[in-house]
Regions:
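N-terminal export/membrane-targeting signals
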Residues: 1-5
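Small-residue-enriched, tightly packed secondary-structure blocks
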Residues: 6-217
Length: 217
């Protein structure tokens, strides 16, 4: 590795970028905790425990430059042997959401249920609803009646809009790594953060802890 590259990787994030990373992770953790505190309408814990990774996109807003679409920031956390790893930072754009998602701000949660979906996340641009099957995720007690759903779908998707949380068939959405922020905070790309199963540093650990709290294997 050239000396310049070694120096680049050793640099610490600036206070501003560290604050950005912590803010993204904490917003994702807040949304996830709020969703899971309503057991009858929450994501079944067995599905969280069986997921390869979880994507949380808080406060995704309408984007005037995307017809019918939205844009926002996401965190992606992979399940590891010890629990849940460090959050990698991504962007979301596009999407065909239908009339049910008409609010100015919407939260999204995606469960990546298999290795194929996980590999997709490691690409430079991952289009949901492409080669990896996506389905509206079951909530609460619906899980027992939806066992076959997880066998067919690589991704289970959910949305929360105006206080209503439900599964939604999310399609036409592109998730791309925010490698400016990943490199600034970790000195690594999103792919490296996810592939290397990094432990979450304390300032961005809230989402990993929340996922551990609500996971059942």
């Amino acid at each position: 590795i050239p000396a310049g590259a070694q120096q680049q990787r050793k640099r610490r994030a600036t206070p501003a970028r560290s604050a950005d990373a912590a803010r993204h992770a904490n917003k994702s953790a807040k949304v996830f905790n709020e969703i899971m505190r309503v057991p009858d309408r929450a994501i079944p814990r067995e599905l969280i425990g069986g997921a390869e990774a979880v994507v949380v996109c808080p406060g995704v807003v309408k984007a005037a430059f995307i017809i019918g679409g939205r844009k926002g920031d996401c965190t992606v956390t992979r399940r590891t042997r010890e629990g849940w790893g460090a959050p990698a930072f991504f962007n979301l754009a596009g999407g065909s959401f239908g009339a049910q998602i008409g609010a100015a701000s919407t939260d999204f949660v995606l469960l990546i249920m298999n290795e194929e979906g996980l590999k997709g996340l490691l690409e430079d641009k991952f289009e949901i609803g492409g080669e990896t099957g996506v389905a509206a995720g079951p909530v609460g007690r619906e899980a027992s009646a939806s066992t076959n759903l997880t066998l067919d779908a690589g991704i289970l998707s959910y949305s929360r809009s105006k206080g209503l949380f439900a599964g939604i068939a999310l399609k036409g959405v592109a998730i791309t790594p925010d490698n400016d922020l990943n490199r600034a905070y970790y000195a690594k790309t999103a792919k490296e953060v996810i592939s290397e199963n990094l432990r979450a540093p304390s300032p961005v650990r809230a989402l990993s802890l929340a996922l551990s709290r609500y996971s059942v294997k």
